[in-house]
């Protein structure tokens, strides 16, 4: 499983090649902290909603700290998605490295 740091994601976005940011956290977590433009599909809904994800698209999966998103990234790879990364450190790392306005929780 590949990982991408928040800084690498930001660099790709700045270069005009932003991957899809897939937020797999629960609704209550989004109420605390969210990243604009992220697509939200809760972890438990991923199998039923695979059709919403393009297999050819670059997808970066995020959760709070990187554990759940790593599981989803592995699952997507098993389903044939080859352009998938786990966001290293999750939204906590995003807050620390890119956007301190996002509260850690």
Model regions and ranges:
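Rhodanese-like catalytic fold shared by cysteine-dependent sulfurtransferases
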Residues: 1-20, 27-58, 67-105
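Short, surface-exposed ligand- or partner-binding patches at beta-edge/loop junctions that are enriched
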Residues: 62
